[in-house]
Amino acid sequence: NDTNQDITAVSLRLNAGTVMADSVNQLETTVGSLTASSAGSVYLLEADDLTVGSVAVSVNRVGSAAGVSTVSDAAQADVRTSANGSIVLRSTAGSLTLTDGNTDGVVLSANGSGNVLVQAQGTGSDLTVNASVQSGTGHVTLKAADAVNLSANVTTSSTGTLSVTAGGALTQLG
């Protein structure tokens, strides 16, 4: 954990074959929208407002004959882990908005015993959950310095617990 941002971008699409940072040194970002897929855990610390949803990528590729072609990749959606990976998504001074990036209704999915922590820190920072947040059997914690607005399911099963903490209003719609 340092004072420098690791990634600054309008939109960020992450895909890792193992873990994405760790609990001691999170991946520090300043981005507007985000999607992540990891075979292990995901640890992200956002500097300001962030929307989780869908990100598509188009790049210019230079071929062996120095020609340039545009390559587009299908959109990646949401934040998902496998192999019992946890999801830790926090902002230091901004609101977090969780939206479904595809049509499955789920925005955050921690596999197996993976835990979920989503925390909007800083004065006036809200957490808005517009799509389902889930863990197989892990714990799910949602926190905001100001309001927490829930308009979707938050689920776990078996030994997992759910915790929602709002410094301001707690609203459940639907």
Language model features with spans:
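Extracellular lectin-like interaction modules
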Residues: N1-G174
